[in-house]
Amino acid sequence: MASKESKPSRTTWRDMEPPLRETWNQVLQELVKRQQQEEEEQQGLVSGLQASKADQIYTGNSGDRSTGGIGGKTKKKRGWYKWLRKLRAREKNIPSQFYPDMESNMVGMENLTLETQLEDNALYNPATHIGDMAMDGREWMEWRESAQKEKRKGGLSGQRTNAYPGK
């Protein structure tokens, strides 16, 4: 029963702890790391708009988030993603006053109507033309033919003389 006399592996005792100087160095290293991270976050985030690093705005660093070397994205794609990130970042910066509450009454929207000139215009009143719509087919063909004949006379200065061989 020698196993009971020896200390179990999980318990700790004073001799296991590192000397005080080593722990102090670790504390200093952690402090420096934390300060660097905070500085990076402050540089990357616009104050007051973004709270977390996930919402970070694109800062203009061209090497950002693109993989270099073999297997990396092509320049075209990289450029497009860069543009998209800029666009999304710009959307994040839009203040809330530009997203009005749709349930509240939007000033000026009730007054938006067609001008009287447009209302009087016959194009906007479909009932006026229904009788005139049935145009005589021969009339239409005569008008169309005459317009085309006139065009043929002037032509394209003789470039297409063989376009209409019968006439």
Curated annotation (Swiss-Prot):
Coiled-coil region: 21-45
Keywords: Coiled coil, Host cytoplasm, Host nucleus, mRNA transport, RNA-binding, Transport
Region listing for Disordered, in residue ranges: 1-20, 33-75, 142-167
Motif Nuclear localization signal and RNA-binding (RRE): where in chain: 75-92
Annotated motif Nuclear export signal, positions: 106-115
Subunit structure: Homomultimer; when bound to the RRE. Multimeric assembly is essential for activity.
Name by which UniProt lists this protein: Protein Rev
